[in-house]
Regions:
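Bacterial N-terminal signal peptides
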Residues: 9-18
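Binuclear metal-ion centers of metallo-dependent hydrolases, dominated by the metallo-beta-lactamase
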Residues: 177, 240-308
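Active-site environment of divalent metal-dependent phosphoester hydrolases
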Residues: 84-88, 111-117, 150-151, 200-203, ...
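Sec/Tat signal peptide C-region and signal peptidase I cleavage site
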Residues: 19-23
C-alpha cells in the first residue's frame, strides 16, 4: 500500500523504547480531557502502571480485525482499522468508512488496506507494524515480526493483477505487504494476541511468546483454514479465542470474498466440546477471574460491531 498521511504527526514514538515508568501499585484512572490532546498521556507517564496487575479489560469489536481494548486505568488501544482499497486491484470490501474515534494508541499488524487505515481514527500514538516493545501506563505491546500467509495463485486461476503478482512475492522474497507483525497486548493481567493475517507456521523462535496467552484473536476462514486454526489453538493453548477477519452483515460486502466463521464456531461446540459464548453486543469485558479455569473458550461477536 502507498504511504499515508498520519493524523498523529509529531506524536510518534521510538518503537524499541519503553515509554513511561512502571508503578508497582497504580490504580489511577486516566481522566478524560475536554480537548483532544496528549494531556492524558502526560498524566499516565507520571503515574505509570503495571500491565500484569489484574483488572477489567474492555474489548469492543469494530469489525474485521479492528478491536478497541481499554485498560483498567482507561488507556485505549485500537488494532487494525480498515478501509477500502484505493488501487483498483480489489473490489469494495466495506460498506462504510472506519469511524473517526478517539483512542490513545493505534497499532497495525501489516500493510494491507483492510488493516492499515491508521489515519482514520484520531490516535495520539500510532504504531504501524510494531516490532519490539512499547509500554505506556498499564499497557505493554510486543510486536513479533513474521510473515503474512501466502499461497501463490496459478496464472490460469488469477482474477486480478494482484493475484498474478502474488506468484513471485511469497516469503522470503515478499513485498512489504506480506510482512506481518503479531501484536501481543498485555493489560489487566491478561495477554491478548492479535494474529493479523500471519501464516499458520510461524518462525519457531516466536513460539515462547505465544504459549499460554490468555486470549488469541484469529482470522478464521478468510485467512486461516479451520485445520490451521485448530492446530494453532492446540499448540498455544489460550484460555479464550476470539474469531476475527470474517464477514459481518451490515459492514462487509459480498464481493469481498470474506467468509463467515459460523461453521467453525459450531464445530467447536459439537466436535471439540468447547464452550462457545455468542455475544449479544459488540462489547465484552474480561478479567483474570472470568478466564480462570477456561480452556479455549470462544467469544464470538457475530455481526455485532461498533459504529462510532
Amino acid at each position: 500500500m502507498g504511504p499515508k498521511k498520519l493524523a498523529s504527526v509529531g506524536l510518534f514514538v521510538l518503537l524499541t523504547f519503553t515509554y513511561g515508568a512502571r508503578a508497582q501499585q497504580s490504580g489511577t484512572s486516566v481522566a478524560p480531557s475536554p480537548v483532544w490532546n496528549d494531556n492524558s498521556l502526560i498524566a499516565v507517564q507520571k503515574t505509570g502502571g503495571d500491565p500484569a496487575r489484574p483488572g477489567d479489560v474492555r474489548i469492543e469489536f469494530y469489525g474485521h480485525d479492528a478491536f478497541k481494548i481499554t485498560s483498567p486505568v482507561g488507556l485505549t488501544v485500537l488494532t487494525d482499522p480498515w478501509r477500502n482499497d484505493s488501487t483498483g486491484d480489489y473490489p469494495k470490501w466495506f460498506l462504510t468508512e472506519f469511524p473517526a474515534i478517539r483512542v490513545d494508541i493505534v497499532v497495525s499488524t501489516h500493510a494491507h488496506f483492510d488493516h492499515d487505515a491508521v489515519d482514520r481514527p484520531k490516535g495520539l500514538v500510532v504504531l504501524e507494524r510494531l516490532v519490539g516493545q512499547f509500554k505506556l501506563g498499564d499497557i505493554e505491546i510486543t510486536g513479533l515480526a513474521d510473515k503474512h500467509k501466502c499461497e501463490p495463485t496459478p496464472p490460469d486461476k488469477a482474477s486480478t493483477p494482484a493475484d498474478l503478482h502474488m506468484e513471485n512475492t511469497c516469503p522470503p522474497n515478499n513485498v512489504i505487504g506480506l510482512d506481518n507483525a503479531i501484536q501481543i497486548i498485555e493489560t489487566g493481567g491478561l495477554r491478548i494476541a492479535i494474529w493479523g493475517d500471519n501464516r499458520a507456521a510461524l518462525d519457531a523462535s516466536l513460539d515462547h511468546y505465544l504459549r499460554n496467552v490468555d486470549v488469541l484473536v484469529l482470522p478464521i476462514e478468510s485467512v486461516l483454514t479451520p485445520v490451521e486454526v485448530d492446530a494453532i489453538v492446540h499448540k498455544y493453548d489460550p484460555k479464550a479465542v476470539i474469531p476475527s477477519h470474517y464477514f459481518v452483515k451490515g459492514l462487509t460486502t459480498e464481493t469481498s470474498g470474506v467468509e463467515s466463521p459460523d461453521e467453525w464456531v459450531n464445530d467447536q461446540k459439537k466436535g471439540h466440546h468447547a464452550e462457545v459464548r455468542r455475544l449479544e453486543s459488540a462489547d465484552l469485558t474480561l478479567n483474570t477471574t472470568e478466564l480462570k479455569g477456561s480452556h479455549h473458550r470462544i467469544y464470538y461477536f457475530g455481526s455485532h460491531f461498533e459504529k462510532e
